[in-house]
């Protein structure tokens, strides 16, 4: 039995947007992030990361994200799964400034 289908895929879009923002905040490329996921035990490919990030853009076709990929990306980025699947309170630091820094926008510290 199939459940209702959502063409919006809001959580998958949030993951793509959050991965892109966290990656940029940390100054790492998509290829570097893909390589880092190999150390988590579940590799997420460069092309998968590209598709996730592109799908987060307004008007872009949605792309479903696998739970295992979300877990691996969260570990590689040093955040929780919850931080990847929800929209952050602060878009400047994604509610997770780098260690030793404070966000100038919201004041959050690591």
Where are each of the predicted segments found?
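A short, Lys/Arg-rich alpha-helix, primarily the initiator
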Residues: 1-35
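DNA major-groove recognition helix of helix-turn-helix
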Residues: 37, 53, 69, 77, ...
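Short, basic-rich loop-to-helix N-cap that marks the start of a DNA-contacting helix
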Residues: 43-47, 56-75
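Short, charged recognition helix plus adjacent turn
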Residues: 2, 9, 82-110
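Residues that mark the N-terminal boundary/hinge immediately upstream of a DNA-recognition element
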Residues: 18, 29, 66-69, 80
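Short alpha-helical DNA-recognition segment
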Residues: 27-58
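Hydrophobic alpha-helical segments that drive targeting, anchoring, or assembly
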Residues: 11-13, 60-66, 81, 85
């Amino acid at each position: 039995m199939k459940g209702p289908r959502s063409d919006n895929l809001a959580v998958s879009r949030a993951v793509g947007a959050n991965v892109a923002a966290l990656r940029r905040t940390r100054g790492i490329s998509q290829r570097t992030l893909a390589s880092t996921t190999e150390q988590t035990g579940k590799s997420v490919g460069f092309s998968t990361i590209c598709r996730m990030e592109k799908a987060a853009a307004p008007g872009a076709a949605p792309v479903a994200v696998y739970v295992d990929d979300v877990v691996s990306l969260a570990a590689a980025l040093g955040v929780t799964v919850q931080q990847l699947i929800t929209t952050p309170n602060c878009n400047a630091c994604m509610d997770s400034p780098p260690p030793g820094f404070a966000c100038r926008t919201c004041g959050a510290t690591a």
